[in-house]
UniProtKB/Swiss-Prot annotation, chain A:
The KASH domain, which contains a transmembrane domain, mediates the nuclear envelope targeting and is involved in the binding to the SUN proteins. Keywords: Coiled coil, Membrane, Nucleus, Transmembrane, Transmembrane helix. The lineage of its organism: Eukaryota, Viridiplantae, Streptophyta, Embryophyta, Tracheophyta. GO terms for cellular component: cell plate; nuclear envelope; nuclear membrane. The chain crosses the membrane at residues 460-480. Residues 49-73, 195-264 are annotated as: Disordered. Expressed in seedlings, roots, stems, leaves, and flowers. Residues 215-224 have a biased composition (Basic and acidic residues). This is WPP domain-interacting protein 1. Residues 459-489 form the KASH domain. It comes from Arabidopsis thaliana. Residues 323-446 form a coiled coil. A motif (Nuclear localization signal 3) lies at residues 104-105.
Curated annotation (Swiss-Prot), chain B:
Pfam families: WPP (PF13943). Residues 44-147 are annotated as: WPP. The keyword Cytoplasm applies. Its main location: nucleus. Residues 1-61, 140-180 are annotated as: Disordered. Binds to FPP proteins. Interacts with WAP, WIP1, WIP2 and WIP3 through its WPP domain. Interacts with WIT1 and HSP70-1. Residues 27-36 have a biased composition (Polar residues). Keywords: Cytoplasm, Golgi apparatus, Nucleus, Phosphoprotein. This is WPP domain-containing protein 2. The modification Phosphoserine is found at S173. Residues 1-26 have a biased composition (Low complexity). It comes from Arabidopsis thaliana (Mouse-ear cress). Regulates the mitotic activity in roots. Plays a role with HSP70-1 in facilitating WIT1 nuclear envelope targeting. The keyword Nucleus applies.
Length: 489, 180
């Protein structure tokens, strides 16, 4: 992939050289025909034809969006003025107008010719708007116009006017105009991506690789177109070499182109701008063809319409007949059923009448009244007997209730008597309790007296003992003195 | 030595009054307990008396002789006096009525007494008793009317009896069919 990209870059450099030469020729034509409007148209055609060559070879390697590719290339340029213009060009049309003023101020040397071109470009924008071109296309076309001015100013310094070269350019323009019919807007977008490879930035290469995978199917078609254009470009290069003759000039031009990659974009933009009117005309023709085709289709549809209508009418005419026949048959069947049901009803009604008559006869014959009378008599007797028995039972119950009442009264009397007895007994009990208390008191008193007597007795006994002891001692004392008297003798 | 002797004496002297008091207490309690027992016996007697009439009052069957006599009197009246059936089938004399009524009542009472029912009140048995009496009344009345037709002595009575016999034939056949 990298090798292919390098080879494509080299080819792009060669193409740029050719483009620059053609651009210088265009400038010469512009100078010769300043007053007329036809000169501007011719310039546009040249730019469109040149842009065709540039667009397709670049598309070989790098498909994708133009906007993304456009910005990084600007950074590589040396001149500050060009940078300002190109950055602003991406913005709205109002910004572009301001840039146009800046161009006038900057380029004093070529003020006259540039001013005229600017004046003519403004109506281009109006025509495009009238042509109902999309806003995106307007932006691109306006950008291309301003780029053309810059590129033309730059080239005029290095190139001199040559009559032979102008003639050859005219021939080349004819060939390119014939080819422009096959061109689409896509090459313009691809054109911007090509310089990325020449700048040699690694990040951009990665992005391109990813884009290539996405657009594989598109690349095959573009390769075919590229091969056809490549052969044409080689022929042109041969012709240019023959007429120039000076090898030194060609070598110097190549070096300039290689050093400044931005110019290639400028030339591309210029050619793309000139290409617009042809593409617009072609688009108009295509639109007309589409409209005509649509009208033809409409006429065909109108011609075809009556046929299905006839078929529909036929179907409408045919379809109801069998339905009607079936409905009529159903109605007839239903009527028959109704008649049958009516006859059945009549028969049943007759049966019902017969049954009613038979029931009436049976009633009269059986004599229900007698049976009713007997039943009533039975019920009467039953009721009477039950009444008697119930009444008797009630009387018995009443008598029993009376007995019970008497018993209750007797019981009450007994209860009263028992209560009276209880009262008496309670009184007696109270008396007995009182007596018991009295007795207890008496016992207490008795015990007290007994204790006193006991004390007295004990005291008396002790006294007597004391007296006895004294007596005994006296007796003993009398006995003891006798032995003493005997001893003295 | 003396103090101890005094204490012993005191302890010896105390028991007699306690024994006396205990005897008095026992004498006090005995009459109350006897009276209470008498109360309990009285209450139980009252309860028994209350239960007996309740049992009697709840049962309607079997009826007493007085009720049966009352039923007999009613039957005799219905047979002897005029009524719808008497107008149709004729009335009976008092003597015949009494005999017929007794037979009917005895038979019905027998059937009812033989019947067994789960009800303790005897209401169902009473209903059966009444139905049996009613059936036998009708049978007896019809039989008497037929007999009178056979024994007819008066011409007017004969004509009436003949009409009655014609009328009786129908219901008799109906009864047979109904029985079948």
């Amino acid at each position: 992939m990298d090798l292919e990209s390098e080879s494509s870059a080299l080819e792009s450099v060669d193409d740029n050289v050719l483009i620059q030469q053609s651009a210088s020729n265009v400038c010469d034509d512009g100078r010769s025909l300043d007053n007329g409007s036809c000169s501007d148209e011719s310039v546009k055609l040249l730019s469109t034809s040149n842009s065709v060559e540039l667009g397709k070879p670049m598309s070989f390697d790098s498909p994708g969006d133009g906007g993304g590719a456009y910005s990084p290339v600007l950074k590589g340029q040396g001149l500050r003025k060009w940078r300002r213009i190109r950055r602003d060009l991406v913005k709205d049309t109002s910004a572009n107008m301001e840039n146009s003023k800046a161009l006038k101020r900057g380029l004093s040397g070529v003020a006259h010719s540039h001013g005229k071109q600017m004046q003519f470009q403004s109506p281009e924008v109006e025509q495009e708007s009238q042509g109902s071109v999309g806003s995106v296309n307007m932006l691109k076309s306006s950008g291309d116009g301003f780029d053309i001015l810059g590129s033309s100013g730059y080239d005029s310094r290095f190139v001199a006017g040559v009559g032979f070269s102008a003639g050859m350019d005219l021939e080349i323009d004819d060939d390119r105009s014939s080819k422009s019919s096959t061109v689409a807007r896509a090459p313009k977008v691809i054109r911007y991506e090509k310089p990325m490879i020449s700048s040699g930035q690694g990040g951009n290469i990665r992005v391109e690789n990813s884009k290539k995978h996405r657009g594989e199917s598109v690349d095959f078609e573009k390769e075919n177109s590229y091969s056809s254009l490549e052969s044409d470009s080689r022929k042109q290069s041969g012709r240019m070499m023959d007429y120039n003759g000076e090898n030194g000039e060609t070598s110097m031009r190549k070096d300039d182109a290689g050093g400044e990659g931005g110019e290639s974009i400028n030339t591309d933009n210029r050619y793309s701008d000139e290409m617009d009117p042809l593409t617009e005309a072609i688009n108009g023709f295509l639109a007309l063809q589409d409209a005509l085709e649509k009208e033809v289709q409409q006429f065909q549809e109108i011609g075809n319409e009556p046929m299905p209508q006839h078929h529909e009418q036929v179907s409408e005419a045919n379809s109801p007949h069998p339905e009607i026949v079936t409905l009529v048959n159903n109605v007839e069947q239903l009527e028959n059923m109704l008649e049958e049901t009516r006859s059945m009803l009549e028969v049943k009604e007759s049966h019902i009448r017969d049954l009613e008559s038979t029931t009436n006869q049976s009633k009269h014959s059986w004599g229900g009244t007698e049976i009713v009378v007997e039943d009533i008599f039975r019920q009467k007797i039953e009721a009477e007997i039950e009444y008697l028995i119930y009444s008797r039972s009630i009387d018995n119950l009443n008598s029993q209730m009376k007995l019970i009442d008497e018993q209750e009264s007797l019981a009450e009397e007994q209860t009263h008597e028992t209560l009276n007895k209880l009262g008496r007994v309670q009184t007696k009990a109270a008396n007995f309790t009182n007596r018991a208390q009295d007795l207890q008191n008496d016992c207490i008193e008795i015990t007290g007296t007994i204790k006193k007597r006991a004390c007295k007795i004990t005291s008396y006994v002790l006294i007597q003992l004391v007296l006895l002891s004294t007596v005994v001692l006296l007796l003993l004392s009398q006995l003891l003195p006798e032995p003493d008297t005997v001893v003295p003798t | 030595m003396a103090e101890t002797a005094e204490t012993i004496n005191t302890t010896i002297s105390s028991p007699p009054p306690e024994s006396e008091s205990s005897t008095t207490i026992s004498a006090m309690t005995d009459p109350t307990s006897q009276e209470a027992a008498s109360k309990d016996t009285d209450l139980t007697k009252e309860a028994e008396s209350e239960k007996k009439p309740g049992g009697i009052s709840l049962r309607i069957w079997p009826p007493t002789q007085k009720t049966r006599d009352a039923v007999l009197n009613r039957l005799i009246e219905t047979l002897s006096t005029e009524s719808i059936l008497s107008k149709r089938y004729g009335t009976l004399k008092s003597d015949d009525a009494t005999t017929v009524a007794k037979l009917i009542e005895e038979e019905a009472y027998g059937v009812a007494s033989n019947a067994v029912s789960s009800d303790d009140d005897g209401i169902k048995i009473l209903e059966l008793y009444s139905k049996e009496i009613s059936k036998r009344m009708l049978e007896s009345v019809k039989a008497r009317s037929n007999a009178s037709v056979g024994n007819g002595s008066v011409e007017d009575a004969n004509t009436d009896a003949s009409e009655v016999s014609k009328d009786d034939a129908g219901p008799a056949s109906e009864e047979e069919k109904s029985e079948a």
